Amino acid sequence: CIVANRGYYYIPHIVKKIEGQDSLDARFYERHYTMVEPKHFEPIVEGMWRGVNVGGTSTRARLDGWDVCGKTGTAENPRGRDHSTFLSFAPKDNPKIAISVYVENGGFGASAALPIASLLEEYYLTDTIRRPELLQYIKDMNIYYPAYDK
């Protein structure tokens, strides 16, 4: 979220329910700033945008009508398949959603975490699933990895 917002964040919280008018504590609306100047986030944001929209390992995260930014990652696992990671936010300017997905034993970032994150963003931003083939891909993934000896 800090990269998406170019240097600020809100205190994370979980809402169990909202009764009546908006009753969230005021501190959840307060921006907290890092010590990094916003201008330093621009090259990172641009790189994340290019990775999705120009070319790179994140192109599968493209979503028509939205400027999606993202970065795949692969965390090495000495005891089995690598872990799959994907960080993303959209739209590029004035983000509405930021997401991080980590799939243990999922392989490359683009293999497991990216499709999951992309589908969640798609549903959040459009209130529908436009890519049923991606949903089927996720359902068909075999990310189970049996227990290993210590």
Name the predicted role of every residue range.
Residues R131-K150:
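Short, highly charged C-terminal tails/helix-capping segments
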Residues C1-H32, K39, M48-R130:
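Active-site beta-strand/loop architecture of penicillin-binding DD-peptidases
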